Regions:
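Hydrophobic, aromatic-enriched interface-forming segments
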Residues: 119-157
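CE4/NodB-like, metal-dependent polysaccharide N-deacetylase domain
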Residues: 99-121
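Active-site beta->alpha N-cap acidic-glycine motif
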Residues: 1-67
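Active-site mouth loops of central-metabolism enzymes
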Residues: 6-8, 91-101
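Active-site gating loops and adjacent loop-to-helix segments of metal-dependent hydrolytic enzymes
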Residues: 69-96
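Alpha-helical structural signal in soluble globular domains
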Residues: 25-28, 49-53, 110, 114, ...
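Conserved small/polar residues in nucleotide/adenosyl-binding loops
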Residues: 168-175
Length: 175
């Protein structure tokens, strides 16, 4: 059967509540896919929970704006965390391409090591893969791993995004 609609939730791994909400939306709703933040502290534990949902597509949510890097990079703050998304407001912030390539490759490889197969697709936290300075890196990785990229060009439209946020606890996910 060909998938006609993919409904994807970003940020799997950001927190337990986010992960439980995503799993509940898949189990009880129309969510078909999620993308995983591989540099988050408890990602192994959270990915273990996905084994109960074999029809949930799992991609990698490439990240350079939250948490600690998996590799040695220069685009970190004084605490060793990635610089915030505000660093990239002008959409042209300079990141060393080889460092970016190694970091994102490490995130993909960590996913493969934990899950045992390649991800379904790539996208990125705060859409940083769409920055001109980062586009070649994500395209190179997509080609290397033979993966689709969600939204490979930046939309230039006048619209207001709508954000939905639900607070889930471990009790709520079992409802």
């Amino acid at each position: 059967m060909i998938k006609k609609l993919i409904v994807n939730a970003d940020d799997f791994g950001l927190s337990e509540g986010v992960c439980l909400g995503i799993l509940k939306a898949h189990r009880d709703g129309i969510l078909t896919s999620t993308t995983c933040m591989m540099n988050m502290e408890n990602i192994e534990k959270y990915l273990e929970m996905t084994k109960a949902y074999p029809n949930l597509g799992l991609g990698v949510h490439l990240n350079i704006t939250v948490g600690k890097p998996l590799t040695k990079v220069s685009f970190i703050d004084e605490k060793g965390n990635f610089k915030s998304r505000d660093t990239y407001k002008n959409r042209e912030a300079i990141v060393l391409q080889e460092e970016l390539y190694q970091e994102w490759k490490a995130q993909i490889e960590k996913f493969i090591k934990i899950i045992g197969h390649k991800p379904t697709h790539l996208d990125s936290h705060h859409h940083v893969h769409l920055l001109k300075s980062n586009r070649d890196v994500v395209l190179k990785l997509a080609h290397e791993y033979d993966l689709p990229i969600r939204q490979e060009t930046y939309l230039q439209k006048d619209f207001e995004p709508v954000y939905f946020c639900l607070l889930y606890t471990s009790d709520a996910a079992d409802d």
